[in-house]
Structures are given as C-alpha cells and as structure tokens.
C-alpha cells in the first residue's frame, strides 16, 4: 500500500535461494500468484515447499521434520530480510502515488486515530516506513502492528481486529486502505470498510465488497472515507 515493494521482495527471495543453493527461483508470474494467495514471507515459503518439495540447501539435505523445516524457513527469512533492508538503505524504496499526501492529511486530523498494519517483519517494515515516511511522520501514528506482533497473517482478520481493539475504535468506524484481495479479506473479516489501491500484480483480482477500487491513493478522498464527525 505505502510503497512499490513486490519486485524488491521477489529479488530478495531469489537472491537468498541462490545463496543457500536451494535450487528455487520465483518468476514474476509465480510471485504474483503467491502474493495473491498467501500473506507473509514465511507462509509463502511453507506454501511453496509444501507444494513442490522441500529443498536441499547449504544447511543440509531436504528437511523431513517440522523442526528442521522451520529452521530452514527461519534462516531463509532472516537472510531475505537483510537483503531487503540493504535494498531499502540503497534508496530503492519508492512511495506509491498519493500515499504520503493521504498520510499527512490523516495525521493532521485531530479526530482520527491512525495505524499501520503490515505483514512484514518488524525490522524490514520499520526500515521501509522510516525511508518512505520519515521518523517524524512515523512517530505520529497511534499504532504500528507488524508481522512479528500477530500469530496469524492476512487474510486472517487478526491484525485488524487487534488494531480496532488497541485503538478503541469500533470496526465499522475504521477505514482500511489495502492493495490485494488478501488484504481486503482481512479487513472485511474484521468488519471494516476497505478501500483498494491495486498494484500491477493485483489489478485483476476480485475486489467484491470493497468501498472503492482505484489505481492509487491520489484517487482516494479522506473526507469521504472518514467524514468529520462521522
């Protein structure tokens, strides 16, 4: 939602697969499929390996127990996060059109409470959010809920239900901005209105139930999403 991330994530996964000699490479088309099916990095890898087989890697033979499989996924994800953070530090993260302006408008409204709810690991998410929004803006959010903070990833509604609870705002009075069917399902599952800013990877998904489906945040109106006194 906040920045153009899909290709950066895909390249980071492919680099870590190469470093671990896992014999895996995710094409753009296949990564789109994963993005539209599974939320979170570790669940994506579990889904892929469960479907196509667990790989031999520099850590040893193909893992046969749950413990060894989780150890492999943990190691891959840890290194992938490092690679991704290096890309962010190199200035490769770019905000999606209109999102910074929408954030500024929301932060300027004293009647609104604001939150970021992301499946990304805490380290990677904070790196990106600081790079895109800056520490000053980020500090003004009322709540940050990141991948490490919840036990179940989108499309499970847990992250949004928890946000509603912690903010003290009923779900029906929240407004969620998402970019995928997985995110939409999570928001709707929590009972929240959801506005979609689709990406090149998600534009053809079924967004039935969304309040609006637009190309980017320049086409969203905070006044309509969150009417003053509404």
Predicted regions and their residues:
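Conserved phosphate-coupling serine/threonine residues in phosphotransfer and NTP-handling enzymes
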Residues: 1, 118-120
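Active-site neighborhood of HAD-like aspartate-dependent phosphohydrolases
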Residues: 1-33
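Conserved SAM-binding loop
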Residues: 2, 114, 176-177
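Helix-loop "lid/cap" segments that line or gate small-molecule binding pockets
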Residues: 14-17, 40-66
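Short, surface-exposed acidic
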Residues: 21-34, 53-76, 136-141
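Short, acidic loop-to-helix structural element flanking the phosphoryl-transfer center
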Residues: 70, 85-116
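Short, basic/glycine-rich phosphate-binding loops at helix/coil junctions
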Residues: 76-85, 143
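Asp-based, Mg2+/Mn2+-dependent phosphohydrolase catalytic module
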Residues: 100, 104, 121-230
